[in-house]
Regions:
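Non-catalytic, well-ordered alpha-helical scaffold segments
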Residues: 16-20, 37-46, 357, 386, ...
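Inter-lobe coupling/hinge segments of SF2-like helicase ATPases
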Residues: 60-61, 87, 100-419, 481
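Conserved pre-motif I regulatory segment
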Residues: 63-107
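Accessory helical-bundle/CTD segments and flexible terminal tails appended to RecA-like ATPase motors
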Residues: 344-354, 362-367, 372-375, 390, ...
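Short acidic (Asp/Glu) and glycine-rich catalytic loops that position anionic groups and cofactors
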Residues: 2-4, 22-27, 68-72, 126-129, ...
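Upstream accessory/linker segments immediately N-terminal to the RecA-like ATPase cores of bacterial MutS
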Residues: 1-76, 445
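Intrinsically disordered or highly flexible coil/loop and linker segments, enriched in small
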Residues: 2-3, 31, 49-60, 98-102, ...
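Generic amphipathic alpha-helical segments used as scaffolds and interaction surfaces in large
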Residues: 8-16, 30-39, 79, 136, ...
Length: 509
């Protein structure tokens, strides 16, 4: 079989040929050089596929969208944008003024003001007489965006609408007609906004919220949806270490919101032994008596024989015995409408405590919830703990996060909880998480819906990504169409590692 690895790289690392590597790994799964060679191949296929997606997007002519500023100037903001917001808005405005479609990833910690940046981008599209779409991963988040943007746009000549899988009948028809006629400027919704039957008059910008629910394949599908590829802005509240950006977003430019709006009180985090559970519950009672709300997070849905973790159902029973009908429960096995109904009651203040598994991780906004208790915090990864903590601290005043830990912690768990106590900076936490857990595990848990690496060991993945990225760039520079002998071999690597959608792009191009 022809070789797709650059010969000097293969020789330098002492790697066997592909067939020999396969034979050796079958004979001895612990064969380090054979495994490293195959792991590199998988990462190389990932990097090459992303570069091809980027090249394809860059080669397509989109349309330049230049706003005249009339809508942005009319927006009455109660505060000035942060320096990071202003810088990012300039980057986006510059991208959208180009004929190549924007492909930009916006990373911003919880509360850093991504929504305002997204709104400004959507207003540029509206000023240029194009439509914008905002895609959210869940119905709750879509409705939250719709309500927030509706308030911010009050009094402006901008028409917004919402479309989710649950909208039926005349309401849905009216929305579809408004989108098709161009009467609606901004459409907000779940994946329903890109299903068949939804036709845009002139889609110029797509904003995707909470990127880790939305993989490379979906990004490619979006690019294919419009006759002229729209500009694409992708937002994530989970900071991504630079190495992992190459693996999951290698085709995108990156902006960072790395400062918080003034006046935000940092969340105070305390690590407490689960032996003191009764004292924590007593503290929760005082918190509720003060008219505040709280989240209580449990890691698993049901007790399993293998696990001594406290189930959410059992904790809800304990808290209900103490606080009565102020306690609600949401978990991953509930149906969407059922979950939404409980969340809506919590948001409306009818419930004081929301007991949850990690389904509250993404984006829910209840400013009166100023306490979060996370049970068995030592069983969660850093990025997930940070995301969960970000559910509080969304209003004025001080918020608190209590991390309940087991006894007999490992060194890694101790380091994790100590870091959570000492910093609220998501970018610091993301880099440290990479050191503590390794890239493979981090990618696997974060990028749901995105291909996980199967062969690379967590501690070797970061260096493999850097090396494979350089090699894939070299090949793409020399042989964009993958027509040479090495290019043909690289096509085979894309097929073998299930990245053949990228080969389809080559054929189409």
């Amino acid at each position: 079989m022809p070789e797709w690895i650059e010969p000097s790289l293969k020789a330098r690392n002492g790697w066997p040929d592909w067939r020999e590597a396969l034979a050796r790994i079958h004979a001895d799964p612990a064969d380090a050089k054979a495994r490293e060679r195959l792991a590199y191949d998988e990462v190389f296929a990932n990097q090459l596929a992303l570069l091809l997606v980027r090249g394809e997007a860059r080669s397509k002519r989109g349309r330049a969208l230049q706003g005249d500023g009339r809508l942005r100037d009319a927006l009455k903001l109660p505060y000035s944008p942060t320096g990071a917001q202003a810088r990012t808005m300039r980057e986006i405005e510059g991208d959208m003024a180009q004929i190549q479609p924007m492909l930009r990833l916006l990373q911003g910690d919880v509360g850093s003001g991504k929504t305002l940046v997204a709104l400004m981008a959507l207003l540029i599209a509206a000023e240029a007489d194009a439509q914008g779409a905002l895609l959210a991963p869940t119905e709750i988040l879509a409705r939250q965006h719709f309500d927030n943007l509706g308030r911010m746009l009050a009094g402006l000549d901008v028409r917004i609408a919402i479309l989710t899988g649950r909208d039926k009948g005349k309401v849905r028809e009216a929305t579809l007609m408004g989108v098709a006629s161009g009467e609606i400027d901004i459409l907000i919704g779940t994946h329903a906004i890109f299903q068949e039957g939804v036709t845009y008059k002139d889609l110029g910008l797509v904003v995707v919220d909470e990127q880790h629910r939305f993989g490379v394949a979906e990004r490619m599908m979006l690019q294919a949806k419009a006759a002229v590829p729209p500009h694409l802005l992708v937002m994530t509240a989970t900071p991504i270490p630079r190495t992992l950006q190459l693996a999951s977003h290698g085709e995108m430019d990156v902006s960072k919101l790395d400062e918080m709006p003034p006046g935000r009180e940092p969340i105070q985090t305390t690590v407490i032994s689960e032996d003191k559970l009764d004292a924590v519950i007593a503290g929760l009672g005082r918190h509720l008596d003060a008219g505040k709300q709280a989240y209580w997070v449990c890691p698993l849905v049901e007790e399993s024989e293998k696990s001594d973790l406290q189930a959410a159902e059992a904790r809800a029973v304990t808290l209900t015995a103490r606080f009565g009908d102020k306690v609600g429960l949401v978990h991953g096995r509930m149906k969407g409408p059922e979950k939404d109904a409980v969340m809506a009651r919590f948001a409306a203040g009818e419930l004081g405590v929301l007991v949850a598994t990690t389904v509250i991780e993404v984006g829910v906004d209840v400013p009166n919830a100023t306490l979060i208790v996370i049970e068995h915090a030592d069983r969660f990864g850093l990025a997930q703990l940070h995301q969960l903590r970000g559910r509080v601290g969304r209003g004025g005043g001080q918020s608190h996060c209590i991390l309940l830990r087991g006894n007999g912690l490992s060194e890694t768990s101790r380091a994790r909880l100590g870091l959570m106590r000492d910093t609220t900076d998501g970018f610091v936490i993301a880099e440290r998480d990479l050191e503590l857990r390794g890239a493979g595990e981090l990618l696997g848990t974060r990028q749901s819906g995105e291909q996980t690496f199967r062969l690379a060991t967590p501690d070797s993945l970061a260096s493999l990504i850097v090396s494979a990225n350089a090699d894939a760039r070299l090949l793409e520079d020399q042989d964009r169409a993958l027509k040479t002998e090495r290019g043909q071999a690289a096509r085979m690597a894309l097929y073998l590692f299930e990245r053949d959608a990228a080969v389809g792009l080559l054929r189409a191009g």
